[in-house]
Amino acid sequence: MRRFALIAAGLATVAAAGCSSSSSSTPRSGSSPATGTITVFAAASLTEAFTKIGQQFQAAHKGDTAKFSFGPSSGLATQITSGAPADVFASASPGTMQDVVSAGDASNPQNFAKNFAEVAVPPNNPANVDSVTDLAKHSVKVALCQPQVPCGSVAAEVFKNAGITVKPVTLQPDVKSVLTQVETGNVDAGMVYVTDVMAAGSKAKGITIPASDNASTLYPMATVSSSNHKSIAQQFVAYVLSPAGQQVLAAAGFQKP
């Protein structure tokens, strides 16, 4: 009898432990991952806007977290197609997004913003740059994005429209790196986006490019096919497209696509 009681008690303990384990491991309703964390790969030019959108998203979706990896769109695309864990990809170029879609790593991208090029110079404008054509002068030290990066492609289009040839002293991996070159005074000018000049504040000054010479780029976004957090990823995409997300983008200088 005593042996039976001990066995019964042991079974009761196991059953209780099993119920406790099942309860604690059950994910929240409507959320596939237990942690509620997504990783967003986003173009460097989205740094300020997406950081704020992420904060608002988390406030509106308690328990969910958005972590960001900002960088050159082409580099982020290569990481995704090489198997890097990501849940959302926001590119500064439809072409770069198409590379990811063609590889089967994303589908149904949606354009959520548009950006235009602008010349950035140090606050004191040491080279007296007044227009984009001044970048063709040999005396002006210019920083550009690498040609395969969206901001590099946009700059090339601007130069073609303006009928000038620019020989940069440095090629940078992304637009924020170009802006840093300007802010630190390493160069006299850099080709960035309107949003980057706004984000720089007093650290840089913008030189407007005439509409006839300027070029723009669209920003598409999609969930990554291999995501284990598709529900939250789709909610984040929806938030960026929502009036709240669009308001943040507009305040940062982005235009509607």
Language model features: what each stretch is:
Residues 19-59, 65, 74, 78-81, ...:
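Exported/periplasmic ABC-transporter solute-binding proteins
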